[in-house]
Amino acid sequence: MPSTKFKGYFITIEGGEGSGKSTLLNQLGDYFRNKGFEVIQTREPGGTKLGESIRHLLLNHEDSISIGHQAELLLFLAARAQHIEELIQPALKAGKIVLCDRFNDSTIAYQGAARGLNAKKIQEFCQLVCAEILPNWTLFLDVSPEIGLARTQKIQKVHAQMGQLDRIESEKIEFHERVRQAFLSLVQQEPQRIYRIDANESQSKVLQKALEFLEEQWSDSELKT
């Protein structure tokens, strides 16, 4: 089990578009609450009033604002800095489980590998923003970009959004393939922290795999609280 100076645990869920992160986040939240844990569910960018405003700016087509790659990176990091200070760190200090949809790994994959920004500089920026706030464990939901984007469009049509993809979802398929390959590389670099799950499987199978991994990380006494 990774060492931590906080009483709580920080679990992040990563993956490309349409990989099922939000669904798994909700399922894990229910699971841990039923075990008696206090749980915070959050997302990036977002999680705070400032973060959600930045999210709208970054993802929305409506405003017709041109955002350069470096500006995009810094906006994501600004949202994260506020997220950590306002929500994540206090929750971890209070002994809660924090479940977060995206964190540093997404920045490395999207702004680094896919956008082509300097990987070393991104690591330095992330370290500056996060300091000691790092995930105990990360679940990477691996799905092909073609399948993931098709899922996303289907979900949006169901919610009467006319299947419109957001600013990042609408990037070319090559962009999303670079994102996937970056995540796979991170899994190889940090196998003890990051666990790959085949997100082409059913939602129940994905949840089963996630719980099997997480249950191995905790002692029985902690999980049976």
Curated annotation (Swiss-Prot):
GO terms for biological process, alphabetical: dTDP biosynthetic process; dTTP biosynthetic process; dUDP biosynthetic process
EC number: 2.7.4.9
Reaction catalyzed: dTMP + ATP = dTDP + ADP
Any Pfam family matching the protein: Thymidylate_kin
Binding site for ATP: G15, G16, E17, G18, S19, G20, K21, S22
Gene3D superfamilies from the UniProt entry: P-loop containing nucleotide triphosphate hydrolases
Gene Ontology MF terms: ATP binding; dTMP kinase activity
GO cellular component: cytosol
InterPro entries (alphabetical): P-loop_NTPase, Thymidylate_kin-like_dom, Thymidylate_kin_CS, Thymidylate_kinase
Classification via PROSITE patterns: THYMIDYLATE_KINASE
Keyword field contains Transferase: yes
Keywords: ATP-binding, Kinase, Nucleotide biosynthesis, Nucleotide-binding, Transferase
Parts forming coiled coils: none
Function comment: Phosphorylation of dTMP to form dTDP in both de novo and salvage pathways of dTTP synthesis.
Family: Belongs to the thymidylate kinase family.
Protein name, entry field: Thymidylate kinase
Organism: Protochlamydia amoebophila (strain UWE25)
